[in-house]
From Swiss-Prot:
Disulfide bonds: none annotated. It comes from the Archaea. One of its GO terms (biological process) is purine ribonucleoside salvage. The keyword Ion transport does not apply. Its EC number is 2.4.2.-. May catalyze a purine salvage reaction, the substrate is unknown. Keywords: Purine salvage, Transferase. It comes from Natrialba magadii (strain ATCC 43099 / DSM 3394 / CCM 3739 / CIP 104546 / IAM 13178 / JCM 8861 / NBRC 102185 / NCIMB 2190 / MS3) (Natronobacterium magadii). This is HGPRTase-like protein 2. GO terms for molecular function: transferase activity. Coiled coil: none annotated. PROSITE patterns: PUR_PYR_PR_TRANSFER. Belongs to the purine/pyrimidine phosphoribosyltransferase family. Archaeal HPRT subfamily.
Length: 181
């Protein structure tokens, strides 16, 4: 995790209407994502996650590159929860709220009884993951694990659910700096 920890030293923090937003290659794709950093993170996700599953589930947008790499290494099919509705049979919509926005997302190709692992870049306010977990639970999927690269320490909407996420690292943003816990 040396590369990930070092990359946080230079990560800019921007104010989005009072919300301290971390800008990082893993969670934003900017600055440019070094393949060695991506490789390190993906290997750690694979060592951490319960991968005895039928499908990997990742929310658009920044969970996609992580989950794609895990899917390629494990041959586990990937389901992307999209921000666009396609109107396909069985499509399930969910409403997500983050610290700085809210929108609809759409799940396709998850069936009752599917064992899934959710992989994402960041757990901050927990709004996205809480909504995804509720929707997957309503579908009848079995959420075997939730793994995020970074978790902002503090209250999260996920706290109000039965689901827990495992993070590779826990952080806070204090006075415009990232602090690793």
């Amino acid at each position: 995790m040396d590369r990930l920890l070092a990359s946080l030293d230079d990560a800019p923090i921007v104010d989005k209407d009072g919300y301290e937003y971390l800008v990082h290659p893993i969670s934003n794709g900017v600055p440019m994502l070094d393949p060695a950093l991506l490789r390190e993170v993906v290997i750690e996700v694979m060592q951490t996650a319960d991968l005895n599953v039928d499908k990997i589930v990742a929310p658009e947008a920044m969970g996609i590159h992580l989950a794609t790499a895990v899917s390629l290494q494990t041959d586990i099919p990937l389901v992307v929860i999209r921000k666009r509705e396609y109107g396909l049979e069985g499509e399930v919509s969910l409403h997500q709220e983050t610290g700085y926005s809210e929108s609809e997302m759409y799940i396709n190709d998850v069936e009752p009884g599917d064992r899934v692992v959710i992989i994402d870049d960041m757990l901050s306010t927990g709004g996205t993951l809480a909504s995804i977990c509720t929707a997957l639970d309503d579908i009848g999927a079995d959420i075997s694990d939730i793994v995020v690269v970074m978790r902002k320490v503090g209250p999260s909407a996920l706290d109000d659910t039965e689901f827990d996420a495992t993070s590779l690292i826990d952080i806070t943003v204090e006075d415009g700096e990232v602090v690793v816990h």
